[in-house]
UniProtKB/Swiss-Prot annotation:
Annotated membrane topology: Multi-pass membrane protein
Protein name, entry field: UPF0397 protein PAM_019
PANTHER family: UPF0397 PROTEIN BC_2624-RELATED, UPF0397 PROTEIN SPR0429
The keyword Ribosomal protein belongs to this UniProt entry's keyword annotation: no
């Protein structure tokens, strides 16, 4: 990785973590049981797919840490680590999806939608509630109800906001690439 790439990724992480925090605070819809539909989750998926797993990991880690500390006064490290992990996992297929240089086709939309559904169930439906049970000893019914609502709200947020962000980003870069090819001809 060149020096310019590392600077771009560092700046992307910082700005994206700040946007993640702002979206968590001001662009979420409460659904009950201390659960909200978070547009920040869709933004995390977009950033991770656009810039890769390392950026997704750090945006999830830093953004969720800042959110927890400022909103709640303490940090639930198990949930922060789950956010970081989901950011990393979202970023793994970034070279396959390649929003910057390839069209975000229906096939890629369906692929990533199924991918994020599966990993939302694994991370937020299994790891997060298990960690709450082990660390905090919370009532299992409440923990699993919350995790179910979180999985559903994350899927909804990605379906509505995430797909739109990725499509717009892909369209922007693909139009630029087309214009560059036309001008160079």
């Amino acid at each position: 990785m060149s020096k310019d790439d590392s600077i771009k990724k560092t700046v992307t992480i910082g700005l994206s973590a700040a946007i993640f925090f702002v979206l968590s605070c001001f662009a979420s819809i409460p659904v009950g049981f201390n659960v909200s539909i978070e547009t920040s989750v869709a933004f995390l998926a977009f950033i991770a797919v656009a810039f890769g797993p390392a950026v997704g990991f750090y945006v999830g880690l830093i953004g969720n840490t800042i959110k927890d500390f400022i909103l709640f006064g303490n940090v639930s490290w198990n949930w922060v680590l789950c956010s970081a992990l989901i950011g990393f996992i979202y970023g793994l297929p970034h070279k396959i999806i390649d929003l910057k240089y390839q069209v975000f086709t229906k096939k890629k939309i369906v692929y990533f939608w199924l991918y994020q559904v599966a990993f939302n169930f694994i991370i937020w439906g299994f790891f997060a509630p298990q960690s709450d049970l082990l660390i905090y000893g919370q009532p299992p019914k409440l923990v699993y109800l919350q995790s179910f609502l979180i999985v559903i709200s994350n899927i909804l947020a990605y379906s509505v906001v995430g797909i739109k962000l990725m499509s717009m980003y892909s369209c922007h870069y693909n139009k630029q690439a087309t214009l560059i090819k036309i001008n160079n001809s």
